[in-house]
Amino acid sequence: MIPAMVVPVLARHDLLDRMIMSINYPVKDLLIINNGARDYDYVPVWNQWIAKIWHLRIPSNLGVASSWNLGIKCLPNSDWWLISNFDVEWGGDSLKMFDELSNPNKLLLSNGAPSWCAFSIGWKVVDKVGLFDEALHPAYFEDNDYERRCKEAGIDVSDSFIPLAHDNSSTLKAGFQAKNNQTFENNANYYQNKINNKDYSSGVWSIRRRRQNSWD
């Protein structure tokens, strides 16, 4: 059984429903972090493979890193978390493979495009490396930063052959491309500064940076 699945969403909730309906393996807790709740009156579809669906309606966009962190904080007793994009489709034995290959000491990436469209992260990884850097708001470079920090900490970052169908950049195509054009460079510069300064910290969220990089 998948102990915890965390799925943030901002737009295209129809693709989230498609993802939920594609689940074909037992999931204990599915946590949906609905960053588009102000604009969409959404109710998740039912799937018999999921023991419990938790739907958090967020009044503004937390962004990727903050959403992933919130998922971990909401289900802190899980041995590991499967974090997934909303626009993937599960099929075959992909979820079973994640269950069999994941453990508390590992960061396991999918074979989707990109590989971070679904990944599992163990509690001992979070304990050693920390949470994702919420200064990288709302999207991009949070995965690069975390993988870099894991490697510095000697954590096993494992590629896999776990297949996954993924409609890449669904959020940007839903009307956020222009805003991303503004924030992408800000995040690229922030990430490069961390590299230049050999900064392996989890960063610091700030209200000024949050407002500057707003997609709201």
What are these regions (language model features)?
Residues 11-25:
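Short, well-formed alpha-helical segments that are part of the catalytic scaffolds
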Residues 58-75:
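Glycine-rich, basic loop-to-helix element that forms the pyrophosphate-binding segment
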Residues 93-110:
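Conserved donor-nucleotide/metal-binding helix-loop-beta segment in metal-dependent transferases, i.e.
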